[in-house]
Amino acid sequence: HPNVPEKCDPTNLPILGQGIAIKTACSQSYAGDAEAVAILTALCQAAHVPYQYFVNRSDMRGGSTLGSLLSAQLPIRTIDIGIPILAMHSARELMGTADQQALQQLTAAFFTEA
């Protein structure tokens, strides 16, 4: 977020309009492993879906999802993905419509290939 640049790594941030974000964290606050990332990346490439990577800062607690909990409790491969959002959880969030379209395209490709 531009108002708190000290919370962000300027070399590693999701960009609005550049596709879905594949999220990982060394703290395991996001679900996924190298194999899941490779499978998703291959699916994105085959379906011509734009994607980017987001890695939480390792020196600061970041967001988390239920993905890690689910992957630990269920015998299914799990990976956290999302649409880049500016000012998440604020009164006015901002996203790129192209990213939503990319997510819809990826979802259709996933269920077609599955």
Question: What residue ranges belong to the model's regions?
Answer:
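His/Asp/Glu-rich mid-to-C-terminal helical/loop segments that flank catalytic regions of hydrolases
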Residues: 83-114
